[in-house]
């Protein structure tokens, strides 16, 4: 039977999806399944690795059945995943020793603080490109080994394995034959030296983590192993692509040149700028990460995030009752030509890069008697772009690169007013793709390239279809004037936290 399709598994924070792509890069079938969020204590977040695995089996079956596709028609499988989330399991029994500790979980704050107090922050950043934060996998592994009865001894005996979600899924899909991850996921663990491309012995020693539990690190596009027939409907299918979710989206968006940037607007906003084969160290609190690793080498990226993007629009809907649906925000914002001098700084949970002030709080400034709800809605939309510009300017400053095209995806990318303002404020062309399922597409492309389903990245670029382009339509003088106003508003939010 003709191998006509690539299956992408997109294992996210709240749901698991399987999507089947044809040779034209189109989604021909998909299936989605939510799973439980576990909150044992305030600030703690866990998932059940076994429940995630069951959801994988469910969505793979669902995607095939939905359109009557035979498993024999699947040429390869690609995996993209929520990053940093940590699983440790017994390799002899396949049983997790503890729930997966999710990237959002803050339980290792004290461990990170102790490492900072011991003067180790610069060492970790220099080697891994990351900051000492509970977000990343390293301190989560330490917590499990220190707090689960017998775990540390089992690890010393060589009985335990660690993996981010991609590793756990490949282990299960291959029947326990393959323990592997890719460069993108390894670069999010706080244990991987992104310059030497190896697990860092010194950092492992500091955290008390035996190297024997770690997966082999491979390229993002290569054959890692085959599914065992009893886990893929009687078929052995190569698993040939892996990337963390943000890197997969960046790859799918065709950000293959230095200076190209991807922004995903979800609850927050994730920005990755391709810096080529050079790992750029940030002086602005950005992360240095691996964008992907292919046959022609390792490509690096700067990563920055804003805490409140879609959540700011939800605030208009849920707390202020100014709109009934998030999609209404563009309609009301378009009723006014500008914000009337109003700025909203949605620092509900502090400010991220490049300010890094967890105590900053949200403010609204510039109100007059003529301010109406449309001005407030527009100012909230524009705040997403001002925050994005802050991060993008930090990337430009750190890298010395010119800002090239910006590729946008995520829920808020449907808002034309938002994307036009992004183009105006950055002076860059902004593209929105037809296929906004970019994380899954990235995994599919990486898997397909490894088996020559697609010949090269040029072919991938050709099948990527753009829905709409947005080009700058604002004078430089106006742009600077508006941005100066934003900086004043930011300073007010920062000074509020200090009073």
Swiss-Prot record:
Per UniProt, subunit arrangement is: Homotetramer and homodimer (in equilibrium).
Q: Which UniProt keywords apply?
A: ATP-binding, Glycerol metabolism, Kinase, Nucleotide-binding, Transferase
Activity modulation = Activated by phosphorylation and inhibited by fructose 1,6-bisphosphate (FBP).
Record-given protein name: Glycerol kinase
Described function: Key enzyme in the regulation of glycerol uptake and metabolism. Catalyzes the phosphorylation of glycerol to yield sn-glycerol 3-phosphate.
What EC number(s) does the entry state?
A: 2.7.1.30
Reaction it catalyzes: glycerol + ATP = sn-glycerol 3-phosphate + ADP + H(+)
Sites binding ATP sit at 13-15, 267, 310, 314, 411
Q: Which family does it belong to?
A: Belongs to the FGGY kinase family.
Binding, sn-glycerol 3-phosphate:
13, 83-84, 135, 245
**Which terms under GO biological process does the entry name?**
glycerol catabolic process; glycerol metabolic process; glycerol-3-phosphate metabolic process
Question: Which residues does the record give as ADP binding sites?
Answer: 13, 17, 267, 310, 411, 415
Q: Where does glycerol bind?
A: 83-84, 135, 245-246
Output the InterPro entries linked to this UniProt entry.
ATPase_NBD (IPR043129), Carb_kinase_FGGY (IPR000577), Carb_kinase_FGGY_CS (IPR018483), FGGY_C (IPR018485), FGGY_N (IPR018484), Glycerol_kin (IPR005999)
Q: What class of enzyme is it?
A: transferase
A molecular function (GO) held by this record is:
ATP binding
The pathway this protein participates in, as annotated, is: Polyol metabolism; glycerol degradation via glycerol kinase pathway; sn-glycerol 3-phosphate from glycerol: step 1/1
């Amino acid at each position: 039977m003709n191998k006509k399709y690539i299956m992408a598994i997109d294992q996210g924070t709240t749901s698991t999806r399987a999507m089947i792509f044809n040779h034209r890069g189109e989604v021909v079938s998909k299936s989605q399944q939510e799973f439980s969020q576990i909150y044992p204590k305030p600030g703690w977040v866990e998932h059940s690795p076994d429940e995630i695995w069951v959801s994988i089996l469910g969505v793979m079956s669902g995607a095939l059945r939905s359109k009557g596709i035979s498993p024999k028609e699947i040429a390869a499988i690609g995996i993209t995943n929520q990053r940093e989330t940590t699983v440790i399991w017994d390799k002899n029994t396949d049983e997790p020793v503890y729930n997966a500790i999710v990237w959002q979980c803050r339980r290792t704050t004290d461990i990170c603080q102790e490492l900072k107090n011991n003067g180790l922050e610069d060492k970790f950043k220099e080697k891994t490109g990351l900051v000492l934060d509970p977000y990343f996998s390293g301190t989560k592994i330490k917590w499990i080994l220190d707090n689960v009865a017998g775990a540390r001894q089992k690890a010393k005996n060589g009985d335990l394995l660690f993996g981010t979600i991609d590793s756990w899924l490949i282990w299960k899909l291959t029947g326990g034959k393959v323990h592997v991850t890719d460069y993108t996921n390894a670069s999010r663990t706080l244990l991987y030296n992104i310059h030497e491309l190896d697990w860092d012995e010194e950092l492992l020693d500091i955290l008390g983590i035996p190297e024997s539990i770690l997966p082999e690190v491979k390229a993002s596009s290569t054959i890692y192993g085959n599914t065992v027939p009893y886990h893929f409907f009687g078929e052995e299918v190569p698993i040939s692509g892996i990337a963390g979710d943000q890197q997969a989206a960046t790859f799918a968006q065709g950000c293959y040149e230095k200076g190209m940037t991807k922004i995903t607007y979800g609850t927050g906003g994730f920005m990755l700028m391709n810096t080529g084969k050079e790992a750029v160290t940030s002086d602005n609190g950005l992360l240095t990460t691996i964008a992907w690793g292919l046959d022609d080498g390792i490509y690096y990226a700067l990563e920055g995030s804003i805490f409140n993007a879609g959540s700011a629009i939800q605030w208009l809907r849920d707390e202020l009752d100014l709109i009934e649906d998030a999609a209404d925000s563009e309609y009301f914002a378009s009723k006014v030509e500008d914000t009337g001098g109003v700025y909203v700084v949605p620092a509900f949970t502090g400010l991220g890069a490049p300010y890094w002030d967890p105590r900053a709080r949200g403010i609204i400034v510039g109100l007059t008697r003529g301010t109406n709800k449309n001005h407030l809605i527009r100012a909230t939309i524009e705040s997403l772009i001002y925050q994005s510009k802050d991060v993008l300017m930090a990337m430009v400053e750190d890298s010395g690169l010119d800002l090239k095209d910006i590729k946008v995806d995520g829920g808020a990318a449907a808002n034309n007013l938002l994307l036009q303002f992004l183009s105006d404020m950055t002076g860059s062309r902004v593209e929105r793709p037809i296929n906004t399922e970019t994380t899954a597409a990235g995994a599919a492309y990486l898997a397909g390239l490894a088996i020559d389903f697609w010949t090269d990245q040029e072919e991938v670029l050709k099948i990527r279809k753009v829905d709409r382009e947005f080009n700058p339509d604002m004078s430089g003088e106006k742009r600077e004037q508006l941005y100066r106003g934003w900086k004043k508003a930011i300073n007010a939010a920062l000074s509020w936290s200090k009073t």
